[in-house]
């Protein structure tokens, strides 16, 4: 695992240059996703562990990977000879990440994280807990200049999810969201969860394996809505659809300027468990912040008649596929020895 050791050494050099004593790398993305695009697989790149759940924390001398029991065997194999210790979550003898860091560092030391990769709530909790030991949490991306051959963000165009499948128009969905915003006394709603955005704007994509989502952000206010997405992902058809539904389109990174430009007298609604700290820091301190579960999360949980019918059709197809598998298995097991990989 020479390559992993070299990456750890490069990161530790960056830590020293930045005056940082520890760095935390989760296995998520700026949208609080568990299943993520290759571009954001930072934890996998630094450790070699490619399970869907896990976090790496390292100091200038030690490193550990925290993951749950699903991955104890896999992580043990993939971390071999990397100098990264496997920290088995759920066992009484395993300290949590912040407790481990607090023990390894001293008062006055700094811990760094990429604020894009942590939700507002998780960042605040870490900051508060570390402060009890006199340790400061700082926002800095130390991997951007180290991971030089990083994959590009997905560029495949997204597509419109037709109302015959969605069962509700974008106009009606925005009306429902604005009604919920009014109840929460919010002028602006900032969205970052990809499933929420796909549902609200009736769009789908192939940006994340096995998840039909589009990498984007969104802002909804009392009179307008804006989708922040890479221009190359838009087609004439999708742009026309969004414009017909009074949805503005801007570049993916333009979300930061949009957040900074929100007037100081406005109230901004964010889901603290989903919205990342980097975006949150872009909002003026003078703006009022409302923290609540995303209204979209609740709205999309209640299925309309079209969606329920779609589920029924999907279950029929799923049942046919499972029946075919059972038939195949019943015939094969009589003739040969089968394994999980057969």
Positions of the model-derived regions?
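Terminal domain-start leader segments
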Residues: 1-342
């Amino acid at each position: 695992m020479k390559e992993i050791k070299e990456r750890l050494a490069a990161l530790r050099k960056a830590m020293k240059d930045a005056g940082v004593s520890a760095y935390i790398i989760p296995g998520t993305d700026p949208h609080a996703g568990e299943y993520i695009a290759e571009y954001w697989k930072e934890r996998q790149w630094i450790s070699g562990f490619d399970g869907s759940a896990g976090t790496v924390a390292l100091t200038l001398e030690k490193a550990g990977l925290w993951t749950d029991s699903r991955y104890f065997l896999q992580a043990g194999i993939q971390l071999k000879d990397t100098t990264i210790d496997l920290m088995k979550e759920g066992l009484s003898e395993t300290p949590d990440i912040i407790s481990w860091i607090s023990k390894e560092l001293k008062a006055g030391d700094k811990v760094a994280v990429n604020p894009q990769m942590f939700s507002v709530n998780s960042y605040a909790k870490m900051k508060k807990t570390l402060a009890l030991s006199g340790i400061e949490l700082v926002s800095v991306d130390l991997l951007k200049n180290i991971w030089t051959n990083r994959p590009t963000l997905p560029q495949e165009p997204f597509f419109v999810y037709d109302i015959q499948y969605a069962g509700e128009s974008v106009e009606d969905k925005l009306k429902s969201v604005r009604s919920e915003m009014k109840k929460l006394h919010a002028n602006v709603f900032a969205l970052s969860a990809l499933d929420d955005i796909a549902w609200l704007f009736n769009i789908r994509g192939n940006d994340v394996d096995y998840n039909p989502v589009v990498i984007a952000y969104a802002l909804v206010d009392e009179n307008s809505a804006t989708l922040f997405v890479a221009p190359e992902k838009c087609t004439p058809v999708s742009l026309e659809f969004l414009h017909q539904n009074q949805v503005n389109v801007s570049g993916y990174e333009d979300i930061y300027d949009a957040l900074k430009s929100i007037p100081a007298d406005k109230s901004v609604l964010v889901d603290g468990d989903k919205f990342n700290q980097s975006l949150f820091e872009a909002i003026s301190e003078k703006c009022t912040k409302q923290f609540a579960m995303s209204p979209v999360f609740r709205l999309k949980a209640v299925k309309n008649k079209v969606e329920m019918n779609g589920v029924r059709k999907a279950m029929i197809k799923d049942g046919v596929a499972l029946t075919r598998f059972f038939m195949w298995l019943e015939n094969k097991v009589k003739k040969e020895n089968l394994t999980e990989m057969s």
